Design a protein with these regions (language model features):
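Short proline/glycine-enriched turn/loop motifs at strand-loop junctions of beta-rich domains
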Residues: 23-29, 538-540, 547-548
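C-terminal beta-strand-rich structural cap/linker in extracellular carbohydrate-active enzymes
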Residues: 24, 59-63, 558-575
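Conserved alpha/beta catalytic core and glycan-binding cleft of carbohydrate-active enzymes
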Residues: 83, 277, 281-453, 533
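Conserved, mostly hydrophobic/aromatic
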Residues: 22, 65, 117, 138, ...
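Glycine-rich phosphate/pyrophosphate-binding loop
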Residues: 80-116, 329-373, 381, 444-489, ...
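The feature marks proteins involved in alpha-glucan
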Residues: 1-15, 19, 39-116, 121-126, ...
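Glycan-recognition and catalytic regions of carbohydrate-active enzymes
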Residues: 3, 411, 417-426, 451-531
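Substrate-binding/active-site clefts of carbohydrate-active enzymes
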Residues: 82-83, 105-109, 118-289, 295, ...
């Protein structure tokens, strides 16, 4: 089977040749540049498009565009940019890939156990091809979905992915577009969904050429923390909106992805009658979503339940940040930074966010709790994982709570093997930008007591150093066998007793906190059964009465209440 998404942007191979289109409204003329200094004038239309067609080009041909200032720029819709964003693009024939994942239609969201990974640090090689070698391991653990951090082409050889500047081109440091497709189809053959993290709120600070020939892509009406805001609601925004809608469709159709994770939708500024996030969600639902499961996961600091309305927006789920913050405070005892907002009634807030997230009108599977992710680990000065910050018994209780709830658990790469390697912030900038990022990173932590002194801040790793990247690679040779066995056991329990009882309907859940750290949560499941959690997230015993039903799992001691860092999960049959 072959798959391709045709779009009005960039280069398209067809009929023995190729068409080239560039939206460059600021340019009077544009030339297509090919090998051996060949240039072809492009035809300009009144709406700022420049186009031409050629018959003597094939897949792999390098091309770029010469704009008014005389310099060459890559195709902003390039499917491949092997020579970094500053270099030329390469023609790709999407129909050259023969898909071998059969009649894969995805999986319903109630089956999701999501595993976030960064391609560059997931394996020693840091490539799409090498990641295939870990798929059997993930399937055996009980993972059912990969959530891959952004792969859009970025400057240099290492980056988290949120500084991408060519959103259609997988970064060449990970491999080719063909390599990425092989990773996805091999995941499908093992029953694993694949979601891709995409960034639609800004372009990276280095390597973005759009302002030179299409400044209309940006607006001064809005601001973002990371650079110029994208123009989704001003003059010429129609083309800009189409660019990102097609990008979403391109990834899901041409790469046969099972969905997307939209980064920081609170920073996607759009005052249009219909927000761009809704247009993207509807395009996915009305397109590839008609024939298979296509999921849309959001990151949204504003916790807006309207964006998760199943009928209006077609969005699937959102990361449950409040649950993480409360669990982290209870397990680690940390209260600095934003954790300071979660030091009062922490147990009650934890129970509430577990019972119904931030809205009782949404089903449990609309929320994704987590103990670790790239933000919560990587935005620490030293990138420490929770395994280094919490007592082992606290970590075990929190892991069981994460995996044995009706909400959809999100794991961070290496968590299942008890990885203790850091996940640091890293990039590959140079010159003034590199210095600004390094110093900005250190100033960011000046308000934390442990980094108040300049000497302490000087020890924060330089994000531009290759050492920060290399230190962040998972150490598979030192996997914790006991931790892995626990994840296998807990996810088997989830698969057998919880997943079959989950659906897309909001249901009643009760919660309470009866002592510091002691939480009670009772969920009503789709078949009328009730799942009861009684957990003590503290180092002191708590007088919690046992819940009715059959015990699915227990942590610590539960005789006459709950001992420190203890909990029980019971399943009560429908009445």
């Amino acid at each position: 089977m072959k798959r391709a998404h045709r779009m009005p942007f960039g280069a398209e191979l067809a009929g023995g040749g190729a068409s080239f289109r560039l939206w460059a409204p600021a340019c009077e003329s544009v030339e297509l540049l090919l090998a051996r200094e060949r240039s072809v004038p492009m035809h300009r239309t009144a709406d700022g498009w420049h186009a031409t067609e050629l018959e003597d080009v094939v897949a792999g041909t390098a091309y770029s565009f010469r704009v008014d200032d005389g310099d060459a720029v890559p195709d902003p819709a390039s499917r491949s940019n092997p020579w970094d964003p500053q270099g030329p693009s390469a023609l790709v024939d999407p129909l050259a890939h023969e898909w071998r994942d059969g009649d894969w239609r995805g999986r319903p969201w109630n089956e999701a156990v999501v595993y976030e990974l960064h391609v560059g640090t997931f394996t020693p090689e840091g490539t799409f091809a090498a990641a295939i070698g870990k798929l059997d391991h993930l399937a055996r653990v009980g993972v059912t979905a990969l959530e891959i951090m952004p792969v859009a082409d970025f400057p240099g050889s290492r980056n988290w992915g949120y500084d991408g500047v060519l959103p259609y081109a997988p970064d060449a440091s990970y491999g080719t577009p063909e390599d990425f497709k092989r990773l996805i189809e091999e995941a499908h053959r093992r029953g694993l969904m694949v979601l891709l993290d995409v960034v639609y709120n800004h372009f990276g600070p280095e390597g973005n050429q759009l302002h030179r020939y299409a400044p209309q892509f940006f607006t001064e009406a809005h601001q973002t923390p990371w650079g110029a805001a994208i123009n989704f609601d001003g003059k010429h925004s129609g083309v800009v909106r189409d660019f990102f809608i097609h990008n979403a469709l391109y990834w899901v159709i041409e790469f046969h992805l099972d969905g997307l994770r939209l980064d920081a939708v609170h920073a996607i500024h759009d005052d249009s009658p219909t927000h761009i996030v809704l247009d993207i969600a509807r395009a996915l639902a009305d397109g590839p979503g008609r024939d298979r499961h296509v999921h849309l996961v959001l990151e949204n600091e504003r916790n807006d339940p309207a964006l998760l309305d199943r009928r209006a927006t077609h969005a699937t789920a959102q990361w449950n940040d409040p649950w993480h913050h409360c669990a982290h405070v209870l397990c680690s005892g940390e209260t600095s930074g934003y954790y300071g907002h979660f030091t009062r009634d922490t147990a009650r807030l934890l129970a509430q966010s577990f019972a119904h997230g931030f809205s009782e009108s949404l089903p449990a599977i609309a929320f994704m709790p987590f103990l670790q992710n790239h933000d919560q680990v990587g935005n620490r000065a030293m990138g420490e994982r929770l395994a280094l910050l919490a007592p082992p018994e606290a970590l075990r209780l929190a892991q069981a709570a994460l995996l044995l709830s009706p909400q959809v658990p999100l794991l961070f790469m290496g968590e299942e093997i008890g990885a203790k390697t850091p996940f640091l912030y890293f990039c590959d900038f140079h010159g003034d930008l590199a210095a600004a990022v390094r110093e900005g990173r250190r100033k960011e932590f000046a308000a934390f007591p442990e980094f108040a002194a300049e000497e302490a801040r000087s020890k924060i790793p330089d994000p531009n150093s290759a050492d920060a990247f290399l230190a962040s690679k998972i150490d598979w040779d030192n996997a914790n066998a006991g931790c892995l066995a626990r994840f296998l056991e807990l996810l088997a329990l989830r698969r057998e007793h919880i997943v079959p009882r989950l659906d897309d309907t909001p249901r009643v859940a009760q919660f309470d906190a009866v002592a510091p750290g002691a939480v009670l949560v009772d969920w009503t499941l789709a078949d009328g059964a009730r799942l009861h959690l009684r957990a003590n997230f503290s180092a002191e015993a708590a007088p919690i009465e046992s819940a009715p039903g059959t015990i699915l799992h227990a942590e610590g001691s539960s005789n006459g209440g709950l001992g420190p860092w203890s909990g029980t999960w019971t399943l009560e049959a429908a009445r």
